[in-house]
C-alpha cells in the first residue's frame, strides 16, 4: 500500500464540500492499495457549448484525483502542489458519468507523477492525463 494517510471514502468526499470538486459533482468511489477512483457526471455542469464533456472538466477530474492521491502519500507537515498537467482526449462523451482511475508512475521524495485514465460508462478510455506534483514541507 502506498498511502501514508488513512482516510475513508466518506472523509475524502467531505473535503470537497464548498469547492469546485463538489460543484462538478466529483465523488471519490474507491481507494485501493495503489489507486484512487472517482466519478463525475456528464451534464450541464461539465458540458461544453456543444453538449459534450468539456476537456477542462476532464482535466479538473484528473487534477482532483492526482492531487488527493499525492496528499495521501505524504506525512504530516507535508503538502502536494501540482506543477504540470496534460490531457489527451480520445473519445467524446455526451451524457451519463465518467470514472477516473489514478495510479502512480513515480513516487519520489520531492516529486511525483500520476497517470489518470478517464473511462465512459461502457468502460472505453475517453481521456489519458498525467499530473506532476511537488512535495513541500
Curated annotation (Swiss-Prot):
The active site is at residue 63. It is an enzyme of class 3 (hydrolase). SUPFAM superfamilies: Thioesterase/thiol ester dehydrase-isomerase (SSF54637). Keywords: Cytoplasm, Hydrolase. Its main location: cytoplasm. Pathway: Siderophore biosynthesis; enterobactin biosynthesis. Its EC number is 3.1.2.-. Disulfide bonds: none annotated. One of its GO terms (cellular component) is cytosol. It is found in: Cytoplasm. The keyword Hydrolase applies. The keyword Lipoprotein does not apply. Required for optimal enterobactin synthesis. Acts as a proofreading enzyme that prevents EntB misacylation by hydrolyzing the thioester bound existing between EntB and wrongly charged molecules. Homotetramer. Dimer of dimers. Interacts specifically with the aryl carrier protein (ArCP) domain of EntB. Belongs to the thioesterase PaaI family. This is Proofreading thioesterase EntH.
Amino acid at each position: 500500500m502506498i498511502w501514508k494517510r488513512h482516510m475513508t471514502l466518506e472523509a475524502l468526499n467531505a473535503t470537497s464540500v464548498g469547492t469546485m470538486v463538489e460543484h462538478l459533482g466529483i465523488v471519490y468511489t474507491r481507494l485501493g492499495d495503489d489507486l484512487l477512483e472517482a466519478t463525475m457526471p456528464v451534464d450541464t455542469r461539465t458540458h461544453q457549448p456543444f453538449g459534450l464533456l468539456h476537456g477542462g472538466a476532464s482535466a479538473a477530474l484528473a487534477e482532483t484525483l492526482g492531487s488527493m492521491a499525492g496528499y495521501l502519500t505524504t506525512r504530516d507537515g507535508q503538502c502536494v502542489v501540482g506543477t504540470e498537467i496534460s490531457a489527451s482526449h480520445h473519445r467524446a462523451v455526451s451524457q451519463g458519468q465518467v470514472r477516473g482511475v489514478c495510479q502512480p508512475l513515480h513516487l519520489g521524495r520531492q516529486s511525483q507523477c500520476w497517470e489518470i485514465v478517464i473511462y465512459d460508462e461502457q468502460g472505453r478510455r475517453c481521456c489519458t492525463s498525467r499530473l506532476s506534483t511537488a512535495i513541500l514541507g
